[in-house]
Amino acid sequence: MINNSDTLKIGNKTFNSRLMLGSGKYRTIENAVNSIITSDCEILTVAVRRLPTKLTNDNTSFLKSLDWNKLWLLPNTAGSQTAEEAIRMAFLGHELACQLGQEDNFFVKLEVISDPKYLLPDPIGTLKAAEFLVKKGFTVLPYINADPMLALHLEDLGCATVMPLGSPIGSGQGLNNISNLQIIIENSSIPVIIDAGIGTPSEAAKSMELGADGVLLNTAIAQAKTPEKMALAMKLAVEAGRLGYLAGRMEKNRMQVQVLH
């Protein structure tokens, strides 16, 4: 980034990278580790449900091979169908963060998904879990549909960000509801992270050009033919989109305006 002061603040933490990555769906551990390093991301989300309660070198070689002085763990509650399940996963996520040396890490990516077919977030369950976790001192990053009113309610509850989906998780369909995403971005006083559905670097750049504060990716990199190359492409796309947003695009005109060069 050209402007080194253009940082992302979530809760009481400040980050230089606006690209966050997921940790699943990679073909090999080597692909995952190399992609994470290449991306220069600083926030890595991990599904608590897929991890053992006690981390050892044998059962979590992937996590143990990462530098947690450079990465901030974002435990997620994926697989939770109710608010109660998500709350339990959030507390387990904090325990896992402690085992990685991040005792002060109370971040949680809140996912309450009651529909196993389409994997769309449950707004009622999300609100219920978010209210409880915020009161317990968690830094809550809720995954939601692109619903402007829901985003405002979650902000009012004290969530640290909102994370509206671009399109259904893992679909690679891109940004299906740009109008609602723009409304959320314009109305939010907390960071807006576009999460889910981004499949290409151009879509990541577009998210940032809209004014989003960051993007979270997983499948687009993990399932690319060459994940490491896609990780670099996404890193550059997010940086380019952010710079383009800060620079301010030219005004659109109804017809060509002649300019003397």
Swiss-Prot record:
Main subcellular location of this protein, as a coarse class: plastid
GO terms (BP aspect): thiamine diphosphate biosynthetic process
This protein's name: Thiazole synthase
Active site positions: 109
Gene Ontology cellular component list: chloroplast
Keyword annotations from UniProtKB, A to Z: Chloroplast, Plastid, Schiff base, Thiamine biosynthesis, Transferase
Record: residues binding 1-deoxy-D-xylulose 5-phosphate: 170, 196-197, 218-219
Superkingdom field: Eukaryota
Keyword Metal-binding listed: no
Compartment(s) where it occurs, according to its Swiss-Prot or TrEMBL record: Plastid, Chloroplast
GO molecular function: thiazole synthase activity
Quaternary state and interactors: Homotetramer. Forms heterodimers with either ThiH or ThiS.
E.C. number: 2.8.1.10
Catalyzed reactions per annotation: [ThiS sulfur-carrier protein]-C-terminal-Gly-aminoethanethioate + 2-iminoacetate + 1-deoxy-D-xylulose 5-phosphate = [ThiS sulfur-carrier protein]-C-terminal Gly-Gly + 2-[(2R,5Z)-2-carboxy-4-methylthiazol-5(2H)-ylidene]ethyl phosphate + 2 H2O + H(+)
Function as written in the Swiss-Prot or TrEMBL entry: Catalyzes the rearrangement of 1-deoxy-D-xylulose 5-phosphate (DXP) to produce the thiazole phosphate moiety of thiamine. Sulfur is provided by the thiocarboxylate moiety of the carrier protein ThiS. In vitro, sulfur can be provided by H(2)S.
Species for this entry: Trieres chinensis (Marine centric diatom)
